[in-house]
């Protein structure tokens, strides 16, 4: 730690930089500052997290950095980019458009083993997190100039196969790209720095004792400020409202709907069953050890809010109310008539399947992208939506919430809330990003007085953790507690 401090004192600040020759896009001033910061890290043998808001061009800045490395003769070994499967075509397209001089190899498909011996002949090698641990032996045999994790929160669990695999790879320099370096708890930040600069934040146990418990459990604001000071030199984070001032602001509208009749009765019966199940769990084990089972118990309650037909193994009467679907089918025809282009996000792929026949009945054109969509087809779907020929794009939160450029959309509908607000913000950023020239309207459909309403309260408190460590003087984190659970399982207020 002392040697790192001495090195930082002698490095000065990043120098102004010009865009590299052959860059296919004009870099904005803040993007040039980002490239200068990446060069500064490389020059001083440091690592870091480029954590700009979603949609501010982290890929463009990284490609410019790689192009400079090539033009100045330092890219004698390839750079390896590890990314989610859904982003492969985006990186391929962006590299071809922005930095055509970079030779790019994609490791994909059953015959990718044939490409392992060719990696050294390319400037950039792309692979995915699911393939990384399968191919780790071959990848570990090839040294790299730069190892980049795109959407680096994918290795936030230090014990995961992907996180263990990246630690086996050899590279001169390391970089994380993510719009959400911190989503749920401080352990995620530790995992990323343990990859970037092992030992910088201590081992997992000491980090838990010195930082996580004081900040997350005890709410010690001073400790949060001290941690922020320690990591700040290695995190570059800019916000849309600060640097992309030409972007119109997002207008967020919460559309609350009330459950009626049989759907309301179903909610109450599922709530009572979930409450009983959770009480039994807590009688047998401690709260922390039961959280996965508790989330599973809460799942049915969330499904009833979204649509009763999501509950498997239960025959629903034909007269069952479907409050959100009815609201959605009122909204979408009106939005399409106004000429709006709409992204509809749901965490439940099955919910999108339930929406499809309703759109057909209304003769509204639509497309869908889920985890079952083959990677090779995703680029064509995005291009078709961007061409403005189809007004409605149904997208599963997990498959399409990261990395896609969907600026043809001016309206985003979140059918169901998710525990982590950053996940929905990432999805919204598919439309609200550089290249968007229209105001963006975001609708969140929420069942009034239900578990969903209480999830919004939890989301607001979770945001305090991000603010406290990544750049504001926020208070400490709030964990998912037993008190929170009692609120989530509380009866719905009488209408």
Region locations from a protein language model:
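ASCE P-loop NTPase motor core, strongest for the SF2 helicase catalytic module
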Residues: 2-220, 228-495
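Short, structured active-site-proximal loop/turn typified by the sulfatase FGly-forming signature C/S-X-P-X-R
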Residues: 224
């Amino acid at each position: 730690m002392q040697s790192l401090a001495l090195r930082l004192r002698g490095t000065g600040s990043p120098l102004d930089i010009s865009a590299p020759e052959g860059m296919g896009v004009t870099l904005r001033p803040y993007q040039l500052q980002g490239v200068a910061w990446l060069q500064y890290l490389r020059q001083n043998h440091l690592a870091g997290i480029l954590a700009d808001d979603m949609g501010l061009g982290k890929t463009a800045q990284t490609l410019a950095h790689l192009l400079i490395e090539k033009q100045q003769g330092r890219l004698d070994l390839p750079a390896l980019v590890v990314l989610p499967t859904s982003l492969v075509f985006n990186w391929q397209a962006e590299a071809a458009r922005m930095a055509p001089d970079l030779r790019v190899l994609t490791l994909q498909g059953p015959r990718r083993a044939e490409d392992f011996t060719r990696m050294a002949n390319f400037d950039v090698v792309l692979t995915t997190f699911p393939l990384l641990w399968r191919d780790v032996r071959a990848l570990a045999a090839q040294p790299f100039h730069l190892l980049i994790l795109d959407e680096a929160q994918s290795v936030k669990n230090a014990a995961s196969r992907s996180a263990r695999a990246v630690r086996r790879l050899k590279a001169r320099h390391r970089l994380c790209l993510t719009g959400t370096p911190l989503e749920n708890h401080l352990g995620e930040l530790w995992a990323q720095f343990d990859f970037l600069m092992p030992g910088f934040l201590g081992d997992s146990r000491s980090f838990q004792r010195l930082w996580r418990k004081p900040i997350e459990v005890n709410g010690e604001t001073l400790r949060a400020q001290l941690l922020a000071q320690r990591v700040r030199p290695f995190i570059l984070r800019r916000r849309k409202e600060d640097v992309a001032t030409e972007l119109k602001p997002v207008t967020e509208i919460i559309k609350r709907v009330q459950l009626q009749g049989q759907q309301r009765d179903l909610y109450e019966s599922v709530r009572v069953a979930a409450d009983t199940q959770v009480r039994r769990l807590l009688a047998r084990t401690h709260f922390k050890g039961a959280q996965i089972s508790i989330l599973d118990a809460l799942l049915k309650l969330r499904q009833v809010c979204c649509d009763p037909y999501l509950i498997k193994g239960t025959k629903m009467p034909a007269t069952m109310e479907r409050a959100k679907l009815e609201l959605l089918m009122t909204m979408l025809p009106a939005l399409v008539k106004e000429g709006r282009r709409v992204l509809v996000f749901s965490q439940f792929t099955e919910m999108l399947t339930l929406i499809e026949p309703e759109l057909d009945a209304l003769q509204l054109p639509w497309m869908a992208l889920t985890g079952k969509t083959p990677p090779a087809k995703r680029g064509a779907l995005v291009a078709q939506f961007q061409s403005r020929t189809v007004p409605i794009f149904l997208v599963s939160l997990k498959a399409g919430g990261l990395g896609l450029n969907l600026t043809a959309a001016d309206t985003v509908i979140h059918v169901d809330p998710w525990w982590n607000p950053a996940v929905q913000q990432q999805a919204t950023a598919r439309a609200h990003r550089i290249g968007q020239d229209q105001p963006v309207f975001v609708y969140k459909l929420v069942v009034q007085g239900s578990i969903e309403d209480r999830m919004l309260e939890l989301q607001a408190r979770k945001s305090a953790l991000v603010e406290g460590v990544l750049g504001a003087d926020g208070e400490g984190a709030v964990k998912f507690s037993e008190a929170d659970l009692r609120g989530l399982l509380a009866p719905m207020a009488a209408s």
